[in-house]
């Protein structure tokens, strides 16, 4: 018996006891270093806490790649067949290819974009995200955008927010999701 055969039924039972069918569940995908080991982990966000449900050790240093990410997600997506899931990822997971793959799986996603990514505002008018005019204390939304000049993937919604400066707390940059 392997870990998945033991662990996944426990996860499925917990999901059934905790969430209603067809309920939206948020999953965070993240990579971390632990004692010179690289761990790719997927967690359920429940009551503002990330509960790990799957992890894999990567046999390398550095960032994960699309193949490793989709392999990990492929293992856990079937556990959520009765739910709507949204995958959340930071800048390591800002791949347009990952977004397309998630969309093909019927999975919603919020993936942080890099500030030097381009979006098409109008026909053939491209703008680097950092040049959209986002300033501390502001936010805006771009709907149905085409993302990245090289891949030109249509139909993305891009949310932009830069936290307001408050006393000693100043966010260094805005977020583009």
Residues covered by each model-derived region:
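N-terminal accessory alpha/beta regions
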Residues: 1-4, 31
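Single, function-defining residue in the core of a domain
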Residues: 3-14, 20-25, 36, 46-177
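An active-site-proximal beta-strand-loop segment
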Residues: 28-40
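Acidic (Asp/Glu)-rich catalytic clusters
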Residues: 43
């Amino acid at each position: 018996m392997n870990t998945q055969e033991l662990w996944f039924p426990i996860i499925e039972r917990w999901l059934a006891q905790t969430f209603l069918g067809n309920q939206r569940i948020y999953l965070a995908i993240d990579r971390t270093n632990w004692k010179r080991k690289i761990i790719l982990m997927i967690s359920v966000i429940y009551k503002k806490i990330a509960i790990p449900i799957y992890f894999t050790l990567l046999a390398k240093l550095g960032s994960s790649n699309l193949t490793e990410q989709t392999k990990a997600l492929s293992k856990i997506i079937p556990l959520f067949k009765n739910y709507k899931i949204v995958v959340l990822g930071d800048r390591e997971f800002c791949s347009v290819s990952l977004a397309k793959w998630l969309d093909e799986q019927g999975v919603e996603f919020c993936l942080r974009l890099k500030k030097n990514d381009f979006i098409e505002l109008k026909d053939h008018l491209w703008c680097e995200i950092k040049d959209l005019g986002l300033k501390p204390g502001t936010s805006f939304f771009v709907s149905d955008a085409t993302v990245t000049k090289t891949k030109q993937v249509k139909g993305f919604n891009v949310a932009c927010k830069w936290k307001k400066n408050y006393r000693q707390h100043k966010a260094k940059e805005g977020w583009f999701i």
